[in-house]
Amino acid sequence: TRAAYAGRQKYTFGWTGDSGCSDGVTKGWAQMENQIAVLLSAGLGLIPFTTTDISGYCGDIDDYPAMAELYVRWVQMGAFNPLSRIHHEGNNAVEPWMFGEQAEGYVKDAISLKYSLLPYIYSYAREAHDTGLPIMRAMFLEYPYDSQTFSTDNQFMFGEELLVAPVVK
């Protein structure tokens, strides 16, 4: 949902907004990295169910090969969001096969990984519902006595057990 209201944190999924990278692939990388901070901030604000536009909502794609790695990396990072949804603006699609056979294979692997994690995600979703503790966790939530975790902003814990360090450059 775009809107916020009392109880949102318990019953709905938030969305980080149109991240946009229509100025080119270079801006798209920065936007993907920025989404990590936005998602973690939402969790720290007791909104544990938040997601992003996987693929960056990047406008018309003129050069699929140039966009392929960013698309794959965004899908891989998005597999570790509480909700994964590929969403795009513009007049063309962002289906995995449009980025080439190799990209399609990587995306298939990321989606398969997400499905294999569903029992894990369900357990942490229940915990989030009951306690407000987010599934995507800033490093310092799990390691509060490690001062380096307070300046780590491009990786996160997914639940207690999984460290996620997306490729963002």
Language-model region placement:
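Catalytic-domain carbohydrate-binding cleft regions of carbohydrate-active enzymes
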Residues: 1-169
